[in-house]
Amino acid sequence: MDSGEVAALVIDNGSGMCKAGFAGDDAPRAVFPSIVGRPRHQGIMVGMGQKDSYVGDEAQSKRGILTLRYPIEHGIVTNWDDMEKIWHHTFYNELRVAPEEHPVLLTEAPMNPKSNREKMTQIMFETFNVPAFYVSIQAVLSLYSSGRTTGIVLDSGDGVTHVVPIYAGFSLPHAILRIDLAGRDMTDYLMKILSERGYSFSTTAEREIVRDIKEKLCYVALDFEQEMQTAAQSSAIEKSYELPDGQVITIGNERFRAPEALFHPSVLGLEAAGIDQTTYNSIMKCDVDVRKELYGNIVMSGGTTMFPGIAERMQKEITALAPSSMKVKIIAPPERKYSVWIGGSILASLTTFQQMWISKQEYDESGPSIVHHKCF
């Protein structure tokens, strides 16, 4: 991209975190919680210039006096007014850019409803007046960021998990599987099992503490039963965690019991198959000729795949399910928390991509439905 051109903006809107930055960069400039907070009681902070809503980190830091809402549930936008606030915050407060001066690439969940893609397109062109726009499927971007065009992506974030097989750069829609089980459910489950230990976490603010415990101390056991026995016999896996008020709590087998739900959703009362079985099921829905390439390129992506031990466990479980001679390879890049964003940054800066954008002119001529003809 020559210096005369403006950098495109890449925004990966996740259920839990929004990642935003400039195409061509190797990491997002801004990463903040996808939350909008509103004061619980009007006028509680008289004279502090109280706003009627707060977004992202500011909402997080004032969470004690706010009611927090996530406009993206299970990867899908469910509250457009709040979503618009998040985008506004992204452009003006985080990136400090004028959206009417930059092309914008947004990401979407696999199998995002058509009406949602249209609504995103409409808001970008009509509310923010962007000059050009494109929307890409998250898992496909993750695969690009790993330097592949064929593989199967297990993308697990805060609100939803998808298994997406991709061949030569195109996702295979008939074999995409979704599990409504992700980071937020791990956090909820950890809250539940910690309360069984006598620790009480119930408010939205306390939930954030538990999320931190999860991110710092949880891991996936290679052999769950064996790990449970070890935990019962020794205190080797116990860790202590200091709460904001100074109280120190001890966490033992909860460290691996919470993430185990990814492999056995039944512990959460869910009927779904685990991430291992779902990955296998997705591969089996694909043509027999592409399966070998999928088994050899299982790419993990998203924050909920960051648990230590998850790749090894996945390798073990898939190998057990696959035909005995099959080579199974799990790719878990260290930057996988942001691989969707990184893939978007790569895509939006390719010279070949520049003719793919939906321009403002095309939008004005065709309306929001143009997104189905140009973005796939």
Curated annotation (Swiss-Prot):
Q: Which SUPFAM superfamilies does the entry link to?
A: Actin-like ATPase domain (SSF53067)
What family classification does the UniProt entry report for this protein? Belongs to the actin family.
Keywords on record: ATP-binding, Cytoplasm, Cytoskeleton, Hydrolase, Nucleotide-binding
The cellular location(s) given in this protein's UniProt record come to:
Cytoplasm, Cytoskeleton
Q: What is this protein called?
A: Actin
Superkingdom of the organism of origin: Eukaryota
Q: What is its EC number?
A: 3.6.4.-
Question: Main role?
Answer: Actins are highly conserved proteins that are involved in various types of cell motility and are ubiquitously expressed in all eukaryotic cells.
UniProt enzyme class: hydrolase
What's its catalytic activity?
Answer: ATP + H2O = ADP + phosphate + H(+)
Q: Its GO CC terms?
A: actin cytoskeleton; cytoplasm
- GO MF terms held by the record: ATP binding; hydrolase activity
- A Pfam family it matches: Actin
The species this protein was found in: Eremothecium gossypii (strain ATCC 10895 / CBS 109.51 / FGSC 9923 / NRRL Y-1056)
- Per the record, the gene is ACT1
